């Protein structure tokens, strides 16, 4: 019988079909197994196929694009059916899991011949429950990404102050973490963890406030209340980790323990009692990582672009790792930048050690390329899903550890993080490595059931059995030669398949000869095909039995050896996992050092101040794209540091035309801060960054039609979150606030937002806008600094120089950008005419906007209109505005022509 997983049925899932009073034994068995596994697609093994029936078949047919057929009837209606071949099932499983489906794999657990002897249906049992968060096979996993299962528990508080406990594990690597947060922090925490599956109590699944957030981020599986029972949580954790008390584990809060217990309970059930080895839950302290909400992660394209692609993201740009485990660790660090300056410094020390020693760095990277994914090999072996190549991976990992240790010995005084890695690499047993080396053959099969993975000479009993098996096969070869001579049929062959066993095969024309006396007494006709006829003999049957028995005995001995070796590995699991993590750590450190060396990154100074001073900053992703195109990136400085020595302002108000690079400038400074707190060198000449506790980005917006939100509503929701949550340690980048509504509405909102950031949040901020009127705020807000992106006009065209300078822009050059975008010439021409008229009308108004709007009355009043300057004064002002040292010869010549044009014309 199947072990019932007790996984609750999602509210929108149909129950399994009821079994009628009379049905075939096979269909009766199917209904029984399906009823024990509600809410999962049942892959029901029938020969060489997994078949799906009823609603499962309809779901799988749509999801996989395979033909929906029918098999018999149920309650008078056709039974929907579809199937997938067993040998290609991993491909189909991968697609179903990626769509959020969960699957129960039901195998035949006895030989069909035995079932026929019993005159009964073949026994079948569910041997695996596959869910998005509990994968271990390489064929189903992304090698460069973690596969997290997340459990969420909630405790109700007064006045809506609920607390959330979270626990997440990756059973393919053994990682296990817990934390606690408020409901306001939940979205940012979920975005950081990025789980593949979330398990929640039924009540939380139905919660109107939280459920939409959960379903946006992961496949959500609701479970019954007992899984989240806080009264039994500690007992379940102690049972899983085989400890007497929680003293042997981390000090967890009640909520954290509840979520952690839910995780291990779900794993225990989905793995049908097999327990993957997990590290004890590591507790993440509140505030230990930079908080980044989902919108900011998306806007900054940290791990995926807005189109959902890895290519073009920050992770893609900086990932120089050479191992899958290193790539996973880098992604983890990028998702959770640290807020502890001392820990950041230790990471930077490791990167610097390899940045200054390119020879050692490349030696380490070369050795790491040979290091396999030890953590995932361990997990597969512990769950009984491993193969001979997993054993070899662990053998090769220990060998690589010795090689890396020899190389690291060149460091006279290794930094703390490297020293810790060296200690971890020394932990695995070298005797275990030697034993694996003696046991495993050079050429290994993928599956242990294929045999042939034990080296000749390792086990004498196995060698003897193999000799007997192989000798029998030589007898078959000699029999073929003898049969060919006896019959006079030189083309006679002895072949083998799983249906007939060993058989004699001849052409159709020779078949009649073997079916005629006297040869028919020896050769028994079994099968006629289009061009061949097949026969068996009593002698062949005897030999086949000997070969089968010898082969079965040989495979049995090999499987015993495999289990013995796997047991030794399981006993050494903690040491091997520590070495696997050390490899990943060294891979990340050497990869970031290579990035720094290749792209001229510098070590940032990260401290507990509120400083933010970047000299020669660059956008890491855009710079790489330009480099591939053979173009330079224009670096820019940014100083948001507070205090008396402040050169500029804590809030920069950035104006300039479209396409000038404002958004790139905003993003690059956010990414530099993030990289610094990840523990990476940064793309700049110099960088000093005081710890950023929260990073906010409101750059671009799109409709959220599913929630009935317009583009402007999405923009306002994101802006509200920033203004309500940003502390003085936050870094805020805002682009074009208020552009999605009427001009005066948008201008008013942007104005008020700047004042709030300045007076209430008091955080480091970059604010880009096309509302040039906002630059007047610098007169009343002392920490507001106006900056602009430099452009040049040349013969009616605009040239973007991408330089950020003090000052403000008076034009946005929107029509020029529209022309570059390919608007029809007639539209561009008409737009210029309309703009000229609007600007003329604006100049003719007796009062400026700052006088018109009460909103702006708090700023300094505009001075009385002065008499227009004389022509001589205009010439003097024009000359004063020139900066010869900053001009190219061409620009100087143009300026001279412009001055000449201003001279009064002679009568």
Curated annotation (Swiss-Prot):
Pfam families: MutS_I (PF01624), MutS_II (PF05188), MutS_III (PF05192), MutS_IV (PF05190), MutS_V (PF00488)
SUPFAM superfamilies xrefs: DNA repair protein MutS, domain I, DNA repair protein MutS, domain II, DNA repair protein MutS, domain III, P-loop containing nucleoside triphosphate hydrolases
Compositional bias segments (type: Low complexity): 1-11
SMART domains: MUTSac, MUTSd
Organism name: Rhodopseudomonas palustris (strain ATCC BAA-98 / CGA009)
Gene Ontology cellular-component terms listed: cytosol
Annotated function: This protein is involved in the repair of mismatches in DNA. It is possible that it carries out the mismatch recognition step. This protein has a weak ATPase activity.
Chain sites annotated for binding ATP: 656-663
Region (Disordered): 1-20
Record-level GO BP terms: mismatch repair
Organismal lineage: Bacteria, Pseudomonadati, Pseudomonadota, Alphaproteobacteria, Hyphomicrobiales
Protein name: DNA mismatch repair protein MutS
Protein origin, superkingdom: Bacteria
Record keyword DNA repair present: yes
Keyword Protease tagged: no
The family this protein is said to belong to: Belongs to the DNA mismatch repair MutS family.
């Amino acid at each position: 019988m199947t072990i019932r997983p007790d996984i609750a049925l999602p509210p929108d899932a149909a129950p399994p079909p009821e079994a009628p009073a009379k049905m075939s034994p096979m269909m009766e068995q199917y209904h029984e197994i399906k009823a024990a596994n509600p809410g999962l697609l049942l892959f029901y093994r029938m020969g060489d196929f997994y078949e799906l029936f009823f609603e499962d078949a309809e779901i799988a047919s749509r999801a996989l694009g395979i033909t929906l057929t029918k098999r018999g009837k149920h309650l008078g209606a056709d039974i929907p059916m579809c199937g997938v071949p067993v040998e290609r099932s991993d491909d189909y499983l991968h697609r179903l899991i990626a769509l959020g489906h969960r699957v129960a794999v039901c195998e035949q657990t006895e030989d069909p011949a035995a079932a026929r002897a019993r005159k009964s249906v073949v026994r079948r049992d569910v041997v695996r429950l596959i869910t998005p968060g509990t994968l271990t096979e390489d064929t189903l996993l992304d090698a460069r990404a973690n596969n997290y299962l997340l459990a969420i528990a909630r405790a109700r508080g007064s006045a809506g102050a609920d607390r959330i406990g979270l626990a997440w594990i990756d059973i393919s690597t053994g990682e296990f973490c817990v934390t606690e947060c408020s409901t306001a922090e939940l979205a940012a925490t979920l975005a950081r963890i990025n789980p593949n599956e979330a398990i929640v109590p039924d009540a939380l699944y139905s919660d109107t406030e939280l459920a939409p957030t959960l379903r946006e981020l992961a496949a959500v599986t609701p479970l019954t209340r007992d899984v989240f029972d806080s009264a039994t949580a500690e007992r379940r954790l102690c049972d899983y980790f085989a400890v007497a008390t929680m003293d042997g584990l981390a000090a967890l809060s009640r909520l954290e323990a509840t979520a952690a217990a839910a995780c291990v309970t779900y794993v225990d059930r989905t793995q049908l009692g097999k327990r993957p080895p997990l590290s004890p839950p590591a507790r993440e302290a509140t505030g230990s990582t930079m908080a980044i909400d989902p919108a900011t992660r998306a806007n900054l394209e940290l791990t995926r672009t807005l189109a959902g692609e890895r290519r073009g993201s920050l992770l893609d740009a900086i990932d120089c790792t050479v191992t899958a485990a290193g790539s996973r660790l880098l992604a983890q660090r990028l998702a959770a930048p640290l807020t502890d300056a001392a820990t950041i410094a230790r990471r930077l020390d490791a990167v610097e050690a390899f940045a200054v020693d390119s020879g050692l760095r490349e030696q380490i990277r070369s050795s790491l390329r040979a290091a396999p994914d030890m953590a995932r090999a361990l997990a597969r072996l512990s769950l009984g899903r491993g193969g001979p190549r997993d054993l070899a991976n662990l053998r090769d990992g220990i060998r690589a550890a010795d090689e890396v240790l020899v190389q690291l010995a060149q460091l006279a005084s290794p930094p703390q993080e490297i020293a810790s890695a060296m200690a971890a690499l020394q932990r695995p047993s070298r005797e275990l490595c030697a034993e694996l080396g003696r046991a495993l053959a050079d050429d290994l099969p993928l599956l242990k059931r294929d045999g042939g993975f034990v080296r000749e000479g390792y086990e004498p009993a196995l060698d003897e059995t193999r000799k007997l098996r192989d000798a029998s096969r030589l007898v078959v070869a000699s029999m073929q030669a003898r049969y060919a001579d006896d019959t006079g049929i030189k083309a006679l062959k002895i072949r083998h398949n799983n249906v007939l066993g060993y058989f004699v095969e001849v052409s159709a024309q020779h078949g009649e000869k073997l079916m005629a006396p006297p040869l028919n007494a020896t050769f028994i006709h079994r099968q006629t095909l289009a061009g061949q006829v097949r026969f068996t003999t009593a002698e062949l049957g005897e030999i086949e039995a000997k070969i089968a028995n010898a082969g079965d005995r040989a495979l049995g001995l090999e499987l015993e050896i495999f289990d013995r070796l796997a047991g030794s590995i399981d006993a050494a699991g903690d040491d091997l996992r520590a070495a696997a993590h050390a490899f990943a750590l060294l891979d990340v450190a050497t990869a970031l050092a290579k990035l720094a060396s290749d792209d001229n990154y510098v070590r940032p100074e990260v401290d507990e101040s509120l400083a933010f001073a970047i000299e020669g900053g660059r956008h890491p992703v855009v710079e790489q794209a330009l480099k591939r195109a053979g173009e330079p990136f224009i670096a820019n400085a940014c100083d948001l540091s507070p205090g008396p020595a402040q050169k500029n302002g804590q809030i920069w108000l950035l104006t300039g035309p479209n396409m000038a690079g404002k958004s790139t400038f905003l993003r690059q400074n956010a990414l530099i801060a993030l990289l610094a707190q990840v523990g990476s060198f940064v793309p700049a000449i110099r960088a000093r960054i005081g710890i950023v506790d929260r990073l906010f980005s409101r750059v671009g917006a799109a409709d959220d039609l599913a929630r009935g939100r317009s583009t402007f509503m999405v923009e306002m929701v994101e802006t509200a979150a920033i203004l309500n949550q940003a502390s003085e340690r936050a870094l805020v980048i805002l682009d074009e606030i208020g552009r999605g509504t009427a001009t005066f509405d948008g201008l008013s909102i942007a104005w008020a937002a700047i004042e709030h950031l300045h007076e209430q949040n008091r955080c480091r901020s970059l604010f880009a806008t096309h509302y040039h009127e906002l630059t007047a705020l610098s007169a009343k807000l002392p920490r507001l600094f106006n900056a602009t992106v430099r452009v040049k006009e040349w013969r009616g065209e605009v040239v973007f120089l991408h330089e950020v300078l003090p000052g403000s822009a008076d034009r946005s050059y929107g029509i020029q950008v529209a022309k570059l975008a390919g608007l029809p010439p007639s539209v561009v021409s008409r737009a210029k005419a309309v703009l000229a008229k609007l600007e003329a009308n604006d100049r003719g108004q007796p009062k400026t906007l700052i006088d018109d709007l009460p909103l702006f009355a708090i700023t300094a009043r505009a001075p009385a209109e002065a008499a227009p300057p004389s022509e001589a004064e205009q010439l003097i002002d024009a000359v004063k505005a020139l900066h010869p040292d900053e001009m190219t010869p061409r620009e100087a010549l143009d300026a001279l022509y412009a001055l000449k044009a201003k001279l009064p014309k002679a009568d």
